[in-house]
Every structure is written in C-alpha cells, then in structure tokens.
Amino acid sequence: MSKAKQTIHEFDLNVIYDYFSSVERQGPGSQEITLKALSFIDGLTEKSKVADIGCGTGGQTMVLAQNIPCEIIGVELWSDFINQFNQNAQNKNLHDRMKGIVGNMENLPFQEEELDLIWSEGAIYNIGFKRGLNEWRRFLKQGGYIAVTENTWFTEERPAEIQEFWQKAYSEIDTIPNKVSQMQKAGYLPIATFVVHESCWTNYYSIMQKTHASFLKKYKGNKTAEEFVSYQRYEAELYYKYKAYYGYVFYIGKKI
C-alpha cells in the first residue's frame, strides 16, 4: 500500500463516493444485524419520527422502513447517494413515509426533541462517537433512542501494526467499556451492546473486491483511484489478519 495517504479522509471525496456508490451497503452490516438492533427499540408508532444519519444509499434504512411504521428521514452529504436512496424507496414502494435529504451530520436539519430514534450504521466516526452522541442528543425526545455502530477494540492490548493503523485512521477507537461509559456521560441509558458478526465484514470486503477491476478500469491511469483501491485492500488484509482484536459494535442508548 502506498504510504502517501494514511487515512480514508485524505482521498478525494468524489473518488470515495464513486467507489461506494455501486454497492447496497457502504460498510459492514446486514439485514439481520439491523433487525437485531431494532429489536431493542420500544414504543415506535406511526406518529414516531426516525432519522438515519449518514444513510448512504439506504441499505439499512430500507430494512428499518419495512419493519417499523414510522416516518423515516435519511441524511447524507453526497447527493448521488440520496438520489439512489430515493429511487430505492420508490422501487420498494416505501416513498410515502421515507425520504432521503442532502445534509451534514454536523448541522442536522431537525428541531430540538423532534425525533424518536436516531440511527447511524458505520457513519458516526465521521463526526466522532463522543461528539455525535452529545450533539445529536438534543434532537431526541425524552426517552428517545440512539443506535449506532462504532469501530471498537475487543481487547485491552493488540499488535502494534493494527494499533498504529487505527490510531491514524480513527483515533477515537476504544474498548467496549470505555464506549459505554462515553454513552452514559453523554446522557443516555445504555440499553444494549453487541458485536457485529464478522460475516458482515467478510461479505462486505468480498463485495468490494469484486468492484475493484471495473473501478480501476473506469479510472485508468488515475493515481488517486489506484491508491484508494490499494488502501482498501490493505484495510481488508488487516481485518482478516487481526479480526480477533477489533470490529464494529452496535451501541443502543436511551435519552434520559
């Protein structure tokens, strides 16, 4: 892997978004994992309002809409993702109570205590776990829920190679007890915490691997695109090598 760029955020956003636009989910996850997390959420009705922050093209949002009767708003920075999101909702006949809007998770377009549930799979790291929990809390009604996935250490100690990679890629990565403590300090009652199964990661990396050839052909001679694919391959290699030490964890909390 090229050492020129050490984190995903150092690459051209247009290249990143184009890379992820061809897949249903832009990060590790599955219908089963989404439904497992949803099973811990109580009291949602037709009058409830849900926001999926960093929704991407809406793979997990469609699952939510098919299983709860609420109004759902997907928020995503990239307009092409939102176009796909809304087309997917139309195709699944869900557009009457869900829509995607272009927005920034640092400046969400909601009123205080407007939402009953905030959802975010594989996206809160863009603003940071602690910041996201603290800043988004005001949009939740009292007793409202937040459900997010976060890259997390499974052990107190880990090999230097993976420690160095993730400290550079996402310095807020931490252990489960520390993440739960951060949730409590942000004003939530921790409801559930569970590890996202490794099959979500292996399926995700397998799907992405299949897109590399066509992506590189599209960007033939583009050094940035080539470096980005190399970065993604390196990240996958590290996961297969060190998956015992880290992965996604679902954190579900209730505003108190």
Predicted regions and their residues:
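Class I SAM-dependent methyltransferase SAM/SAH-binding core
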Residues: A51-I53, T57-N107
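Conserved alpha-helix/loop element of class I SAM-dependent methyltransferases that forms part
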Residues: G27-E46
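A short SAM/SAH-binding and catalytic strip from SAM-dependent methyltransferases
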Residues: L117-K130
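Short, glycine-/aromatic-enriched active-site segment of Class I SAM-dependent methyltransferases
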Residues: N151-Y170
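Short alpha-helix
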Residues: E172-G187
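A short acidic, Gly/Pro-enriched loop at the edge of an enzyme's catalytic core
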Residues: E106-L117
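Conserved Class I S-adenosyl-L-methionine
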Residues: F194-I256
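A short glycine-rich, Lys/Arg-flanked "PGG" loop and its adjoining helix->strand segment in the class I
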Residues: R131-Y145
